[in-house]
Amino acid sequence: MNEPLASKKIRWKCRRGMLELDILLERFYEEKFRSLTKNEKEIFNQLLDQPDPLLYDWLLGHVTPESSEFKKIIRKIQQLSS
C-alpha cells in the first residue's frame, strides 16, 4: 500500500465511537503523525485496531497496556493532551 493511501486510512481509523477518543486521536494524528518513525506509525495503526473502551482506559491512564510499544505511543498522545 502506498504511503498517502495508508496515511488516509489511518486518519479515518482515528474517528471512533467516542467523542473523547476522536478529539485525542485526531489531534495526535494532525499534529504528530508525520513526525513519527515508520515503526511508530505501524504501532499507532495497530493501536487503532483496539476496542474503544480499552483505548479510552489506556489514554486516561486507568489501565496500562502490556505492550511496551503501545505504552510509548500512548505516552506521546497523553503528552500532547496535557
Curated annotation (Swiss-Prot):
GO biological process: succinate metabolic process
One term under GO cellular component: cytoplasm
Gene3D superfamilies with a match to the protein in the record: Flavinator of succinate dehydrogenase
Stated role: An FAD assembly protein, which accelerates covalent attachment of the cofactor into other proteins. Plays an essential role in the assembly of succinate dehydrogenase (SDH, respiratory complex II), an enzyme complex that is a component of both the tricarboxylic acid cycle and the electron transport chain, and which couples the oxidation of succinate to fumarate with the reduction of ubiquinone (coenzyme Q) to ubiquinol. Required for flavinylation (covalent attachment of FAD) of the flavoprotein subunit SdhA of SDH and other flavinylated proteins as well.
UniProt record similarity statement: Belongs to the SdhE FAD assembly factor family.
The protein's name in its UniProt record: FAD assembly factor SdhE
Family annotation (PANTHER family): FAD ASSEMBLY FACTOR SDHE
SUPFAM superfamilies per record: YgfY-like
Subcellular location: Cytoplasm
